[in-house]
Structure formats: structure tokens, C-alpha cells
């Protein structure tokens, strides 16, 4: 007889309480499609800082909001875009050009292999 998997869920607030300043955080979604906005809002609400954000493969509004809120120190992504809405995400562009965040821009293949190597 096969044992059924037990559901494992956690409240969003509790999940984000396990994240500390300076940690590396991964977010999924693609551009502005299906980003985990409830998690993003909670990270901002809890005032986390200096995060390294592995987002993508192509990051979007979730990354831009975290950057604009001052939560991010480094972004690892193939790009941060709002596509037809605004092109390059505005907070990303401003913070990257001014040197307020560091950026490891890598194509999707390198992004994928780096994640796989770290697993």
C-alpha cells in the first residue's frame, strides 16, 4: 500500500520570518507572469535588507519591487524587465546604474546550470 504524502504548508508570515538579512533568496515566475507577490509584500513588510535575489530566469515586477523597497543588494538573473509595460524595470535600472545593487547578468542556461550545481 502506498503512503500518501502529507501536505506541508506554512503561513506566508512564518515562512518569511525564516529569512534573515543578507541571505540568498530564490523567486520564481517569469517576467510579470505568476510572481509570488504575497511573499514579496511580506519581505517588504518585514523590512529585510541586503538580500541576494536569484530570480527568473527573466525577473520582473517582484524583483523590481524588492529593489525599490531597498531589500536587495545583488540580483542574479538573465534580465529584469516589465516587457511592453516599461521595458527594463525602472527600480532595477536606477539602482544598477547608480551602483546601489550589484548584478550578475547571466543567460538562462548559465542561470539554470548554476542553480543545479548549487543543489
Regions found by a protein language model. Name each.
Residues 2-119:
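Conserved alpha/beta enzyme-core scaffold
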